Regions:
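Membrane-embedded alpha-helices and immediately adjacent juxtamembrane helical segments
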Residues: 2-303
């Protein structure tokens, strides 16, 4: 017991004090890299508990749930202007093929928002209210990212709205890029006279690889541009590599568990997918915020 207590005390002293005084230039590259990543992990754990990231993720999950339908409506309004709304609908049904009832519900409400906005002045006012819900959600995302970076002052309102509008315009095309890669691959096989079903395994690998790449790119942009602080892109990218891979794995598991939800559809209908959807959003924000903490740690590890 004394030996265990002594080793525990030494480990605590090393992690709390000694590791921060090590001169990395005196170590080999491998050891220096290991110590640096240990410091990054310690900074992330410390800021994670201090900023109460778990509670922040729950709050953002609530805001995201409120803005799902308005966000989908805005995306369809934007893609509809480019003639891509049908392609996006096809993508959603194929991607969430075990939750078609809840997709029907979300798309139905989203279409109602669009139709109402086009029919009358009051409908336009309602649509603007829904757009404000999205803006409100994104402003809360910025607030949480600023908390991670210990930034007290937010951008002025014009810059915040400009960034949010840019994100709303770009986000549908990020989704379409992901969809387009799989679509082009399938049509290339058909053009070459090859059986698409015979290459289904390769298609799955390409689809998930593309999903991971899009996730890494999206998260790196979030970590770089959302905080009201200078963030080196290399640090944002390294953090995004972790969160993008973790998010892709979580997404795969989410789609696999929808098979279980399908069995409950006969009893609960579309509501069977709601608890799993809420858990998915919560874990997703948890992963994204850990990535934000990592980007902060990478940038300040040598301070």
């Amino acid at each position: 017991m004394k030996g265990l207590r002594h080793n525990t005390t030494r480990m605590k002293r090393f992690l709390n004090d000694e590791i921060w005084n090590i001169d990395l230039e005196e170590l080999s590259k491998a050891k220096a890299r290991f110590i640096k990543y240990m410091k990054v992990l310690l900074i992330t754990i410390k800021t994670f508990s201090g900023e109460k990231i778990g509670f922040q993720a729950v709050a953002l999950s609530f805001f995201s749930t409120m803005s799902v339908v308005p966000f989908v409506a805005v995306i369809f309004a934007i893609t509809g202007g480019f003639g891509l709304a049908d392609k996006l609908t096809e993508f959603l049904y194929s991607y969430f093929n075990n939750s078609q009832q809840i997709i029907d519900t979300i798309l139905g409400f989203a279409q109602n928002i669009i139709n109402t906005a086009q029919s009358s002045a009051m409908g336009l006012v309602s649509a603007l209210l829904f757009v404000w819900i999205i803006i409100w959600m994104m402003m809360n995302v910025e607030r949480v990212f600023n908390n991670v970076w210990m930034v007290q002052k937010s951008r002025n309102l014009f810059k915040r709205l400009s960034m949010i509008i840019a994100m709303l315009i770009v986000s549908p095309f990020v989704v379409m890029v992901f969809f387009g890669g799989s679509f082009v691959y399938s049509h290339a096989l058909s053009y070459l006279g090859l059986d698409v079903e015979s290459f289904s395994t390769y298609k799955t690998i390409i689809t998930w690889t593309l999903f991971g790449a899009v996730a890494v790119f999206t998260f790196s942009a979030m970590y770089k541009f959302i905080p009201n602080s200078y963030v080196e892109y290399s640090n944002a990218l390294r953090a995004a590599a972790f969160s993008g891979i973790a998010f892709t794995i979580m997404q795969y598991l989410y789609l696999e568990t929808q098979v279980f939800v399908t069995r409950l559809n006969g009893i609960y209908g579309a509501f069977a997918a709601v608890p799993l959807f809420m858990v998915w959003i919560n874990i997703g924000w948890f992963i994204i915020l850990i990535g934000a903490e990592l980007s902060y740690a990478f940038q300040h590890v040598d301070d």
